[in-house]
Amino acid sequence: GLPICGETCFFGKCNTPKCTCINPICYKN
């Protein structure tokens, strides 16, 4: 599995740096 950023996302953007939104969770690049 991908490392989770600990952030949820709803519009394709994550506030955490170097994180990508895979709805509804942000994952580290």
From Swiss-Prot:
Q: Where is the Cyclopeptide (Gly-Asn) crosslink found in the sequence?
A: 1-29
SS bonds (residue pairs):
5-19, 9-21, 14-26
Q: Which UniProt keywords apply?
A: Disulfide bond, Plant defense
PTM info: This is a cyclic peptide.
Q: Name one Pfam family in it.
A: Cyclotide
Q: Which domain of life is it from?
A: Eukaryota
Q: Which PROSITE patterns match?
A: CYCLOTIDE
Gene Ontology terms: biological process: defense response
Purpose of the protein: Probably participates in a plant defense mechanism.
Give the domain note: The presence of a 'disulfide through disulfide knot' structurally defines this protein as a knottin.
Q: Family assignment?
A: Belongs to the cyclotide family.
Return the protein name. Answer: Cyclotide mden-F
Q: What is the source species?
A: Melicytus dentatus (Tree violet)
